[in-house]
Each structure stands twice: as C-alpha cells, then as structure tokens.
C-alpha cells in the first residue's frame, strides 16, 4: 500500500532523491531521452507525488542544473589540489570532463535542449539562471587562480560552452562538420582555452 502521509523531512529527502536521480539520468541520456516517468519510478513514488515537487519537467531540469553547479566546482578544486597534476593538466582534464559530460555525470545541454528549455522559462527564471551561471563560471576561474572580472567571466563562459556544445552537436545538429574529427576538434578548442587562461593565471599571481 502506498504511503499516505510524509513528514517534511521525508518530503525533503524525496525531493533530493528526485533531483539526484534526475541529474544522473539527464546527464547520461540527455533531456529529450529522459522522461518524468523514469525519474519518479526510479525513486519509487507516484506521478502525482512527483508533480507536487516539480510542476513541470523543465522545473526539475533547472533545479538539477543548480544542484550540479557546486558539484562541478568541487570537482574543479579537486583537480587543482591534485599533486600529480600540473595546472595545465588539471584545467585540461576539467574541460575535457565537461565536454564529454555524459561519460562523467555532467549535464551539458545541446543546442536543441537549450532552445526547448529556455523558451518555456519566465523572464525572472531566466534571469536567475543567468546570474547563477555567471557566478559558477566566475568561481571556476577563481578556482583556477585567475581574477574573475565581468568581461573575463563572460568570455570564459562563451568559449567553454562553445567547446562543450559543439562536441555534442556533431554530427546531428551540425551535419557539415566532420564527425571523424570531432574529438580532435574538442582537443584543439580545449588547448586554445588553456593557452588563453595560462597567462591570466601568471598575471594574477604577479599582482
């Protein structure tokens, strides 16, 4: 018999479980191939109970992305602290893990997924997401030992997302790109990003 009443603590645990399982499935399968049913069944609750936490699939996705942000930052710091890795190796490994997010439990939205998700967000929800995104990428830069002014954060955000999204887009969304060269393209972009960041780290260190 299904449980009728949940305490507030139990509800909080269920909500956390939905986000954790949702993030896991979304990162592995993508937004379009992950259903609400898969998530609530994995947690062991009903469809109705799921919607008492998240009124739409999109609202769960946004919350899952927010859950992911501090985890990504912890991962970046772990690489920075690894004595076996040089600065370049740590940054390269971090960016590579993000570009191949589905293999590393990191949710990266494709172009189509971004369009589908954000056209359904309110202006306020979109503004909040952008603020959190800017804060995340600024924190990542600071984790790398680089000063995070607005212009620098904006550029780092764009060039990082460009590498991640292009990798996900070949060949389905970008059919004119050569799929056999996709990995080499990602490696080239990551090296270019690291080459751009390294002098900024030295500049920040000398101040």
Per-region residue spans from a language model:
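C-terminal peripheral helix-coil segments that are non-catalytic and often amphipathic
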Residues: 1, 135-146, 162-207
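Helix-turn-helix
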Residues: 25-59, 63
């Amino acid at each position: 018999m299904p449980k009728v009443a949940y305490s507030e603590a139990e509800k909080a645990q269920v909500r956390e479980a939905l986000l954790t399982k949702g993030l896991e499935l979304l990162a592995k399968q993508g937004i379009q191939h992950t259903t609400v049913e898969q998530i609530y069944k994995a947690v062991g609750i009903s469809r109705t109970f799921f919607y008492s936490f998240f009124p739409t699939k999109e609202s769960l996705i946004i919350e899952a992305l927010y859950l992911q942000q501090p985890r990504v930052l912890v991962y970046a710091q772990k690489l920075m602290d690894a004595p076996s890795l040089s600065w370049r190796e740590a940054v390269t490994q971090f960016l590579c893990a993000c570009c191949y997010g589905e293999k590393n439990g990191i949710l990266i939205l494709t172009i189509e997924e971004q369009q589908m998700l954000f056209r359904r967000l309110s202006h306020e929800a979109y503004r909040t997401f952008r603020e959190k995104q800017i804060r995340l990428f600024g924190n990542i830069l600071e984790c790398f030992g680089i000063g995070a002014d607005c212009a620098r954060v904006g550029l780092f955000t764009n060039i990082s997302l460009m590498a991640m999204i292009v990798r996900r887009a070949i060949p389905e969304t970008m059919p004119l790109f050569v799929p056999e060269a996709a990995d080499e393209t990602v490696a080239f972009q990551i090296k270019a990003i690291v080459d751009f960041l390294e002098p900024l780290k030295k500049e920040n260190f000398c101040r």
